[in-house]
Amino acid sequence: MAPSLWKGLVGVGLFALAHAAFSAAQHRSYMRLTEKEDESLPIDIVLQTLLAFAVTCYGIVHIAGEFKDMDATSELKNKTFDTLRNHPSFYVFNHRGRVLFRPSDATNSSNLDALSSNTSLKLRKFDSLRR
């Protein structure tokens, strides 16, 4: 069908929803005046609201067009297995592994020198970051 028909259907549905809301507000004010506040909405207002909502949703679904498939195979056809979970933005090269996996003789000599001078320890920390 023509897109203008679905837009018209949505317009009619929204108008019916607005009319149902106005009718509900009028009914509530009438119930306050008659001091019968514990009664519920009449069935015709409830049915009009539900029908208008269904008509509006039906029109909106037809205006939206074709939906995409939920199956991911159509989007993954042109990707290789290596690039599937490859996120280079998460690579970190400045980490503590360089200090942890240093040869043991360099670690022992740095520990002895660190005990001798506190200032050299601070400088050595910055040197390890520059390497």
Curated annotation (Swiss-Prot):
Q: How does it sit in the membrane?
A: Multi-pass membrane protein
Q: Major location, coarse class?
A: endoplasmic reticulum
Q: Keywords, A to Z?
A: Endoplasmic reticulum, Endosome, Golgi apparatus, Magnesium, Membrane, Phosphoprotein, Transmembrane, Transmembrane helix, Transport
Task: Kindly list the residue ranges recorded as spanning the membrane.
Answer: 4-22, 44-63
Sites where Phosphoserine occurs are at 120
List the Lumenal topological domains: 23-43
Q: Which residues lie on this side of the membrane: Cytoplasmic?
A: 1-3, 64-131
Function of the molecule: Part of the endoplasmic reticulum membrane protein complex (EMC) that enables the energy-independent insertion into endoplasmic reticulum membranes of newly synthesized membrane proteins. Preferentially accommodates proteins with transmembrane domains that are weakly hydrophobic or contain destabilizing features such as charged and aromatic residues. Involved in the cotranslational insertion of multi-pass membrane proteins in which stop-transfer membrane-anchor sequences become ER membrane spanning helices.
Q: So what family is this one in?
A: Belongs to the membrane magnesium transporter (TC 1.A.67) family.
Protein name per its UniProtKB record: ER membrane protein complex subunit 5
Q: Which organism is it from?
A: Mus musculus (Mouse)
